């Protein structure tokens, strides 16, 4: 989940980018808060193109184990190349899931951890993990530029493409199906709740009147006509931004998956283990903040390490506009 839909027209992603322009967000801050222990076991719950994972792996060393999860099989293919860049690396496939176990055997980087790449949602982070077995969890939530930059994936309103929006192309429900089958009230509620769009009813009415809608460009045109910007804040972003965010969150169950991850984290973390979450819009950040606070105050299993969210420096924001809306929060298992 979520590239920021209020500040960045196309959104931002989890350490994402095209294969050629892979710039992880808040990289130093995330690695510092994760406090990687040599020889430990760590989970990158949103491995993306492997940017954060690579830095974790360098610190783990040969005794360590890094587990990388992602819904997107294309991202996993690229992450494999990023994490195993030399010809001497070895890859073993584990049928029928397509999950990959990677291990270094080249001479240059013999001090390299075992790396397991799993095609699964971070909601399933606890699957296969015993209680108190993990030293750290990193989750960089959101849609990646790999997904945004491919018109065929249907995430961006800036290019003509099918209304797909599935992070996992193998999942069943597309944005087109949702958009053309919800009634007007249900659609308005989705746009308001997941897009925080105040003009949700007006937009939903226009969508229903224009159905069937099959493409990103058609949907963007319908929204633009129904919700023209009236003030400077609205003019700062494309009128379709929040609606596209809402549909993407619904199709991919992003907030439910985030809640599942945060519920599982204290069970699988060792004492002293840390969970670090980077989010990109207020819905996600609120869920993380509340889960960490409740874990500290009510259940006593967390110590919150970030009383306020950590944000990118001006230098990083200038260098990487996707970082402008990123917020990092961290907690330690006690």
Predicted feature locations:
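S-adenosyl-L-methionine-dependent methyltransferase catalytic core, i.e., the SAM/SAH-binding region
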Residues: 1-87, 99-334
